[in-house]
C-alpha cells in the first residue's frame, strides 16, 4: 500500500505504475475490492497529458476505478440495481439505487461519483435518513438496505439512494 496514508494518493501511485507498465505489455488494472477494472493504457502519461497526477487526483471519476460502479439484475425483482463498491477504502459509504433499467447507468454513476467526491474532499459524512440535493429540484434520500435486500451487503456501509423531488423532502 505504500507509505502515504491517503487512499487516494495510494491509488494515484498505482495508476501511474499501471500506466508505465502498459508500455511493457500490461493489459489491465484490476481493483478487486471495487469490483472493476480498466485497460492499463488509460493511465499512460501520453493519454493523461502533462498534468496527469492532478487529473488522477481531482478529475478522474472515482467510480471508474477507485470505487467501482456495478449494475446487476436480481431474480424476481424488476429493474436494475446500481451500486458502488470499494468506497470503504476511503472511509466512505457505498451507495446503491434501484433503477428502472440499464439506461439510467450514467445518471447514477454521475450522482454517486459527485457525492463520493464531495464527501472525500469536504470530510462531510452521510448516513441513513440524510438528504442531499443532486439536481436543480432533485434530492437523494438515504436509507439502510432492507432485510430482504441482502444482495446490497458488503464489507462496509451501503446506503440506498432514493431520488425524490424538492416538494417531497419535507413530506417524509
Q: Language-model segments: what does each one mean?
A:
Residues 6-17, 104-111:
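Short amphipathic alpha-helical segments
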Residues 1-4:
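Long, hydrophobic/aromatic-enriched structural stretches that serve as scaffold segments
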Residues 11-30:
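Acidic, low-complexity cytosolic segments
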